[in-house]
Design a protein with these regions (language model features):
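C-terminal accessory/interaction regions of large nucleic acid-associated machines
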Residues: 92-317
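Flexible, glycine-/basic-rich loop-and-beta segments that form/coincide
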Residues: 46-98
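Conserved Class I SAM-dependent methyltransferase catalytic core
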Residues: 1-34
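Residue-level marker of positions within ordered structural domains that often coincide
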Residues: 31, 68, 116
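Generic structural hydrophobic/aromatic packing signal, biased to beta-strands
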Residues: 33, 59-63, 111
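Flexible loop/turn segments at secondary-structure boundaries
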Residues: 4-10, 36, 40-46, 68-71
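Short, contiguous acidic/charged loop-to-helix segments that flank catalytic cores in large enzymes
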Residues: 5-17, 49-54, 96, 217, ...
Length: 317
């Protein structure tokens, strides 16, 4: 199944009218949803995809016959269960390198597995909770879970996320930036020193990847941030391809994984704000990650081999 047609549902996140209808029919037929998984089938060059962030995949549904004698729970119970199980499922999806554009679709499975586990979910008025409302809750908790991952990022990057959500790469007032910096335990001057912020004439803005210095060396960066890692990787990937990006990943070592995690959060922000160009860059980096990682490992092994040969040669002489 491949569908992406969002509908804004004020106060309860974003739902998908196509999924509402389809899942309701599956459940009515007596099935429960136990999983969803994206399979790369959709063509980026099809007419409806030109100029848009279309799904990269169709979605495989894993279904089982529902237990009609299952328990009845309340909406509050469902929220508690989703907050317990969905974060674990999200980590699994990210580790499997699901494309950010497919993340919301992939999360439907674990969320609906909880919803269809029970005979009924009752709202505050004692009425059955609809599939539409269940999907809204799943999307809401997915957003909350991604926001909670911000705790893995450094203070400068948390500031950049908050600023980017409001202004993107556009200019904003220095005073607003300074107030936000205090809340994030950093400073505008420090952010400028970090190398990704420009401050001039009472205005500040985050530098675009193409504006970042081409001679950047993470090993010499005294204020290395997750934000810099992501955007330098995008710069290198777009200008030099996967091979050059792999060289940078090899330099970053284990820190690179946190940069990949940040891409998911940034993609979600861009999609919500309808910033298609930026969203495309974050999605492309994650989709290229397996090949970049493979090339980085190959480069590391080659360097180790060369070092061993050099050492043996020195011993011989």
């Amino acid at each position: 199944y491949a569908f992406k047609q969002y509908e804004s549902n004020s106060g309860e996140g974003t739902t998908n009218t196509g999924w509402d209808t389809f899942l309701a029919a599956v459940i009515k037929a007596g099935f429960g949803i136990s999983g969803t998984w994206p399979i790369r089938t959709e063509l980026a060059n099809k007419v409806s995809g030109i100029g848009h962030n279309m799904l990269a995949s169709s979605i495989v549904l894993v279904c089982r016959k529902r237990d009609l004698n299952a328990n009845v729970i309340t909406r509050r119970d469902l929220i508690t269960a989703l907050k317990t199980e969905l974060p674990r499922a999200l980590i699994h999806l990210q580790r499997a390198n699901i494309a950010p554009v497919d993340l919301a679709q992939g999360a439907i499975g674990p969320g609906m597995e909880v919803y269809t586990r029970y005979a009924k979910v009752l709202d505050a008025e004692g009425k059955p909770l609809t599939v539409h409302d269940a999907l809204a809750l799943i999307n809401q908790i997915l957003d909350e879970t991604l926001a909670e991952q911000e705790g893995d990022f450094d203070a400068d990057s948390r500031w950049a996320l908050a600023w980017f959500e409001q202004f993107g790469f556009d200019e904003g007032e220095y005073g607003v930036a300074e107030i936000l910096s205090k809340a994030k335990n950093t400073s505008v001057e420090g952010l400028v020193d970090a190398g990704f912020l420009k401050s001039k004439g009472g205005k500040v803005r985050i530098l675009k990847p193409s504006e970042l210095p081409v001679d950047w060396d993470p090993e010499k960066d005294k204020r290395l941030t997750n934000w810099e890692m992501v955007h330098h990787l995008i710069r290198v990937l777009e200008s030099g391809g996967e091979s050059e990006a792999a060289t940078l990943v090899a330099q970053l070592g284990s820190k690179a994984e946190t940069a990949r995690e940040l891409c998911y959060r940034l993609y979600t922000l861009c999609e919500r704000k309808k910033r298609a160009a930026e969203a495309l860059s974050y999605n492309a980096l994650v989709q290229s990650w397996p090949e970049i990682s493979r090339l980085a490992t190959d480069q590391h092994q080659m360097e180790e081999t060369e070092e061993q040969v050099k050492t043996q040669t020195e011993i011989t002489f």
